[in-house]
């Protein structure tokens, strides 16, 4: 590779990084005012009811989402402001859109390489296009409340990823030897379909967060939305690291930069898990900045993968072959999408620690 080509590759990586910074900076989170924070900090929670009253409320038909909270004697979760709720939902829509875009391009390349020999291989393309459209619609929608089209599309995306994982597992098991390193390296990527499921889950979470019910904080599956999102983002990042680690191990980590996506994102995953399970704190500045670095890593990774395509015989002049055989260009932004979801979780928890 010539010096000129290396320079072009570096400029491309910097340009992609600039795009990532612009995306992260767009529509940034505006925390509550200092006066509101001080009043919230001074406010005392209502006294817990006696144990007998808690037991009676738990078994007397109280709302399922609030039974455990009442039984433990925890204070009820105050409602998050509508503006903060919609803002977090739009960030989740951007997360779902990035994941859907990565799935669309990656599955198109990989399934084209497989000659679409199974008609089901067209399904992730159609579903990811619909998911991207729903994400774009949600990003531009400043209203609260669920949208039936987006809700249906995200549910279909979640189901598609689960079914696709079954297809990929079947592809591996039908090869000689079954689950051996050779088949895990060169068979259908076992973790890839879960990316469209993550897009669907993030989009569904956005609809839950948007759902405007006065007097209560947003909840997902009956649990506080902020903590649930942090846990979901943590699991998604960790699963993506596993897939990346397998493929970079196949590449023998010949470039030291290949260690970055298996070292930085696990820290982000651990920080988000601490956010989900740890004590309620308003200031998680280190977690926020580490998530921003993880998001930036997704864009910079595209530049490294473009350099990997250039290293193959013929470089970009032989793009029709090297795009199929080189490192997948659309894969790294999955980290960006999941980091954005983690940032949305932090936004909710900063506005209201019980959300």
Feature annotation, model-predicted:
Residues 1-355:
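Short amphipathic, positively biased membrane-proximal segments
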